[in-house]
Amino acid sequence: MSSYIPYVIERTGRGERSYDIYSRLLKDRIILLSGEINDHIASSIVAQLLFLEAEDPEKDINFYINSPGGVITSAFSIYDTMNYIHSDISTICIGQAASAGAFLLSSGTKGKRFSLPNSRIMIHQPLGGAQGQATDIEIQAREILRLKKILNEIMAHNTGQKIEKITQDTERDFFMSGEEAKKYGLVDEILTKSLK
């Protein structure tokens, strides 16, 4: 099944121009993460962040997130780029930000992390699976524990929570409303109107 991408027509004094909706949003410094986070999606988000940084490093970027999560190493590539560039990044949860999506939501510029009123946010520990020889499984287990430690440290920094609380709360799926996520420190405000 192919996905439908809407197009918008923009009229100017020089004529009409057709844009796919994502390109039009990018003109307004808006990036949309919708769906599962994988290497392909992460590469697209990273490219958009780098493009907007090159356009104007002083202007904010609005990063809208509606994601069930995904591959943590893919999310780390987005996270590292968010911190690498100079532009402030407003993160806005629309719908849900779960797992790696919640991690990215919390990683926006402090004071500029938002949720819509009926959004759902969920944090948990990284998921993984391994097969093969016992040694291969042991290597993968050590790596997932290393990633869990890094993720918990970043989440503690982002939220202001103690590392022990993050570790305990992410032991299983931990769901929050927008308001609960605000109290937890994942977001700073609940939005009811556009950021304009």
Swiss-Prot record:
Q: What is this protein called?
A: ATP-dependent Clp protease proteolytic subunit
Function comment:
Cleaves peptides in various proteins in a process that requires ATP hydrolysis. Has a chymotrypsin-like activity. Plays a major role in the degradation of misfolded proteins.
**InterPro entries listed in its UniProt record:** ClpP, ClpP/crotonase-like_dom_sf, ClpP/TepA, ClpP_His_AS, ClpP_Ser_AS
Keyword Cytoplasm assigned to the entry: answer is yes
Which Pfam families is this protein grouped with?
A: CLP_protease
Work out whether the entry's keyword set contains Transcription regulation.
Answer: no
Q: From the Swiss-Prot or TrEMBL record, state where the protein is found.
A: Cytoplasm
Gene behind this protein: clpP
- A GO CC term? endopeptidase Clp complex
Active-site residues annotated for this sequence: S99, H124
Q: What is its EC number?
A: 3.4.21.92
